[in-house]
């Protein structure tokens, strides 16, 4: 029986999620305006750090999912970066991408790098390209050549700006819709692996 706290600490189907009984594990949080815009109030970063979390991956900006594809900044990115840094945590940043071309991916990379300039960003700057029905990118999901090229363009631009790049992608898309050899041999991968066979107890 696996519980939620075990998800990072197991080996399944040949994929190393982590090692059993690992003592060097580093816990982190993924935050965006969704965490701030709720009824629970302001994030207490001191409490987060005291709970053992060592790093924060902060959503800094994105591109709208509509046809216009406008760039936007996360309304709480500065507050979240400053709060995490003040609590002594390491900070990384990510861009919610809706790029449909290499040129747009480069634009997104420069946009986020401009926003985080001046902050001590020691964790990766991440390309978080996503799609689903109704998104401007919905017809590009299986376009492996373009998705790979956009990922490379974003990462190379981020690297040229002095940051460590990373690619966020779910397991299925990683195995089916990008060139894994080109990406994994050159860039770090933040692999999202969503479990969907929960019992009511929260165990599987």
Name each model-derived stretch.
Residues 5-8:
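Solvent-exposed N-terminal domain segments of exported/luminal and surface proteins
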Residues 10-92:
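N-terminal carbohydrate-binding/catalytic regions of secreted carbohydrate-active enzymes
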Residues 1-2:
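Short, small-residue-biased leader/transition segments that mark boundaries at the very start
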Residues 46, 50, 79-82, 86, ...:
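Solvent-exposed, polar/charged alpha-helical surfaces in well-ordered, non-transmembrane soluble domains
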Residues 73-76, 100-113:
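Glycine-rich anion/phosphate-binding loops
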Residues 115-125, 129-204:
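Surface-exposed substrate-engagement region within the catalytic domains
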Residues 26-30, 54-60, 90-95, 123-129, ...:
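Structural recognition of the beta-strand scaffold that forms the well-ordered cores
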Residues 33-38, 55, 61-66, 97-102, ...:
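Solvent-exposed loop/turn segments at secondary-structure junctions
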């Amino acid at each position: 029986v696996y519980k939620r706290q075990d998800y990072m600490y197991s080996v399944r189907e040949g994929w190393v999620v982590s090692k059993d009984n690992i003592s060097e594990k580093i816990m982190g949080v993924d935050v965006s305006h969704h965490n701030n815009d709720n009824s629970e109030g302001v994030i207490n970063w001191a409490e987060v750090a005291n709970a053992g979390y060592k790093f924060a991956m902060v959503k800094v900006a994105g591109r709208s999912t509509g046809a216009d594809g406008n760039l936007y900044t996360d309304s709480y990115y500065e507050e979240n970066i400053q709060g995490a840094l003040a609590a002594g945590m390491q900070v990384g940043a990510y861009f919610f991408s809706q790029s449909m071309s290499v040129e747009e991916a480069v634009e997104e990379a420069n946009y986020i790098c401009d926003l985080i300039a001046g902050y001590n960003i020691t964790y990766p700057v991440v390309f978080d390209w996503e799609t689903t029905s109704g998104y401007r990118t919905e017809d590009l999901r299986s376009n492996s050549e373009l998705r790979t090229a956009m990922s490379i363009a974003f990462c190379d631009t981020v690297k040229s700006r002095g940051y460590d790049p990373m690619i966020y992608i779910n397991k299925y898309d990683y195995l089916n819709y990008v060139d894994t050899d080109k990406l994994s041999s050159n860039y770090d991968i933040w692999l999202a692996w969503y479990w969907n066979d929960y019992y009511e107890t929260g165990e599987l």
